Amino acid sequence: MLRIAKEALTFDDVLLVPAHSTVLPNTAELGTQLTATIRLNIPMLSAAMDTVTESRLAIALAQEGGLGFIHKNMSIERQAEEVSRVKKHESGVVTEPQTVTPTTTLRQVKELTARNGFAGYPVVTEDYELVGIITGRDVRFVTDLDQPVTAVMTPKERLVTVKEGETREVVLQKMHEKRVEKVLVVDDSFHLRGMITVKDFQKAERKPNACKDEHGRLRVGAAVGAGAGNEERIDALVAAGVDVLLIDSSHGHSEGVLQRIRETRAKYPNLQIVGGNVATGAGAKALADAGVSAVKVGIGPGSICTTRIVTGVGVPQITAIADAVEALEGTGIPVIADGGIRFSGDIAKAIAAGASCVMVGSMLAGTEESPGEIELYQGRSFKSYRGMGSLGAMSKGSSDRYFQTDNAADKLVPEGIEGRVAYKGLLKEIVHQQMGGLRSCMGLTGCGTINELRTKAEFVRISGAGIQESHVHDVTITKESPNYRMM
C-alpha cells in the first residue's frame, strides 16, 4: 500500500483572493522580522550562493532594506573580509576606528591608506588618549616620509570632537561650522570612543530605508556548513561583526546539522542563527528545539536545483511553508521561504502562506552587483548562475551542504546545474519592481502590513487552465516588461 502523506501545492497551484480594502499600495508597510531581534524593511534576502551574494550585492540589498548572506565557497579569511566590507561601508559611528600612534611615520600612514582605501587616522597614545588626527591633506605634499605623524597632524587643541551620545543635528552643525568631514567621539577623559564621517550621513540620507544595526552599520549575514571544521569559520565571522549566521544544509532535519546548531548556540547565546533547509513541520520544530532564531524552508524548489529529480525527495513550496509555520506557531520563530520565486506574485504567495520573508537567488543572479562577468551570447547579455549543488560549486567547497565532503571530485553526485541568466541591470531596479508588485497585492487583499498578509489573506486552488489564463496568452510579446520575464 502506498504511504501517501498528503496532497501538496506550490506557487502555480494557488492564487490569492481579492478582498475589501482601505489599503493603497503606496501606504502598505513592508517591514518584517528576519528574527526576533533583526527587522528588515523589505521582506527580501539574497541566497548564499557563489554567483549571487558577495559584499557588493549584500551592500546594495541592505541599502534597499533587505539583507544578503555571503556564500562560503571561499577561504575563512576572505569570507570574514567580505562581511567586514559590508559592516564598514556605512558606519554611522565607527566604534573602533583604525588608529596610529604618535611614533607612526608618514610612510606607514601612506601604506595604510593604500591598503585600506581611506586616509584619515586618529592619533592616540597607548591608553587610547586622543592627541591628534592625520588626514590625506596633511601628507599630500610632504617629501620627508620618515618623520612621525606628530610633525604634520592636526593637534589635540584644534580637533573637532563631540561627546558620546551626541545627537545627529549637533554633529552636523559642528561639521558645518568647522568645515570638516570627520568628527571624533571622545569621553570625559578625552579617550577616543569613535569617529563620525560626513560620507555616512550622506549615504544615510540617500537610502533612508536601509537595513541597519543599532550602530548605524548595514546588516549582513553569512553562511557556514554543518560539518566538522567550521568552528574556526564561525569564530572569524562573529569577530568580523556578522549580524546573522546561516547554518546551511540541503537537509536541515539531520542530526549533524542540529548538533552544529546546538554547539553554536551554546558558544554564542546571543548570536542570531538561521537553520535550514527543511520542508516539513517536524523539521522546522527540530530546528527550533535546537536553538535557531529563524527557519529556512525549501527542498528542491530553486530554478537551478535538481534535488527533487535526483533524489525523488521534496515538498512543493506553498505546502512546505504552511506546514513549517503551523509547527512553529507560538514560538515566535519566523520562517524564510527559500527558492522557487520567479515573480513578485510568488513573493506575495509565500508570505500569505505564512513566511516572514523570502530568499531569492536567480532573481538577483543577473544583476550588476552579483559576482561574475557579463557574457555576450547571441547578441544578449548574460551572467552565469549555478546551484550550490552543481559540480562546479561543490568542487569549490559546497559539497558539505550535500553531505559529500569525503567524495573525490569525480565521485560527486550533483544536485544542481550550471547555467546563465539574462543580465538585469542594477539590483535597486529589481527590488523596486518586486516590492511594487507586493504592495499591489497588499492593496488588492486589504492587508496593510506584512503580518496581516501572513495571517489574513486567503487562497483559492486553481487548475492548469487557471494558471494558463493567469499568464500572458494569445499575443506575441514585442516589448519585455521589467517585472515579467519568462526566462
Curated annotation (Swiss-Prot):
Catalyzes the conversion of inosine 5'-phosphate (IMP) to xanthosine 5'-phosphate (XMP), the first committed and rate-limiting step in the de novo synthesis of guanine nucleotides, and therefore plays an important role in the regulation of cell growth. Residues 93-152, 153-214 form the CBS domain. Belongs to the IMPDH/GMPR family. PROSITE patterns: CBS, IMP_DH_GMP_RED. Coiled coil: none annotated. It comes from the Bacteria. Its cofactor is K(+). The lineage of its organism: Bacteria, Pseudomonadati, Pseudomonadota, Gammaproteobacteria, Enterobacterales. It is an enzyme of class 1 (oxidoreductase). Pathway: Purine metabolism; XMP biosynthesis via de novo pathway; XMP from IMP: step 1/1. This is Inosine-5'-monophosphate dehydrogenase. SUPFAM superfamilies: CBS-domain pair, Inosine monophosphate dehydrogenase (IMPDH). One of its GO terms (molecular function) is IMP dehydrogenase activity. Keywords: CBS domain, GMP biosynthesis, Metal-binding, NAD, Oxidoreductase, Potassium, Purine biosynthesis, Repeat. NAD(+) binds at residues 248-250, 298-300. GO terms for biological process: GMP biosynthetic process; GTP biosynthetic process. K(+) binds at residues 300, 302, 305, 469-471. IMP binds at residues 303, 338-340, 361-362, 385-389, 415. It catalyses: IMP + NAD(+) + H2O = XMP + NADH + H(+). Mycophenolic acid (MPA) is a non-competitive inhibitor that prevents formation of the closed enzyme conformation by binding to the same site as the amobile flap. In contrast, mizoribine monophosphate (MZP) is a competitive inhibitor that induces the closed conformation. MPA is a potent inhibitor of mammalian IMPDHs but a poor inhibitor of the bacterial enzymes. MZP is a more potent inhibitor of bacterial IMPDH. The active site is at 305 (thioimidate intermediate), 401 (proton acceptor). InterPro entries: Aldolase_TIM, CBS_dom, CBS_dom_sf, IMP_DH, IMP_DH/GMP_Rdtase_CS, IMP_DH_GMPRt. Homotetramer. Its EC number is 1.1.1.205.
